[in-house]
Amino acid sequence: MTEQITYALEERIGNPYLFCGREREMNLLLNWASLIPRKISKSRALVGRRKSGKTAIMQRLFNILWSRNSNVVPFYFEVLDPNQLLLDFSDQYIRTFLTQYLSFLTRTPLDNDNESWSWNKVEAVNRDVANNNITEKMNTFLEYFEKGQHHQATTTAFGTPAWFSSRDKVFFVVMIDEIQYMTEYIYKDKQETVQAHRLPGAFHGLVELKVAPMLVSGSYIGWMTQMIQDMFVGGRLKWTPISSQLTFAEGMAAVFRYAEYHNMPVTERSALIINTLTQHDPFYISMLFGSDCP
């Protein structure tokens, strides 16, 4: 990528320089995003084993789209695996969206921890932006939230990107990282006895909207396959496999880049051996250079 990128979202990879290769995947997704204003981009599922680079790809896509400052706005949300109450999950989802949307509108990078803002900060920042739609959506959600109406709160939160698309005349890329966790760790009651195991099904209709297509990821292929078959029937998500391996040439470049970053000189021959032994997998390359072995 030769374009200037502002890293508005702190990437988990650490130093952005360590994002190596992935030219095919990034070209695919950037072309996909460029077609969103034509309303022909279909929602996708990035599927690959853990540590295969899905999060790095999604976060880099976010930062590229944020930097371009066009009418395609990125939204990135990671589903975590601790048990969560559905109301709290919905609150986190919509605050994360509004935080990132206001970050985009004000051209203000997010904090280094990528945390969503409090409602007070969202309201304060929006006073300068003066977006009445944000005020309206906040008030609607908080009314449901304070009354404990989890179904209405969830529906409102999940539908927020599409809602803003029609009112602010923009488009969104809705990225949900590790979406399969939504079937396992979210509960409707504080006692954690009623599981919201079909929660991804709440996106059943939203996933087909071309104004805010979704890009979801999952690390457990069998789990993801079952979820898609059960809750996104009819090919609503385009299966997009992500290999853990770079191309051979990208792997060689990654070896030299990590060697430079760790101040460890390598020759062409030693780089070739490392690239071959690690099967040009950037995770294993990074582990090798980060090890304590001499």
Question: Residue ranges of each PLM-predicted region?
Answer:
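Non-catalytic, well-ordered alpha-helical scaffold segments
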Residues: 55, 59, 87, 91, ...
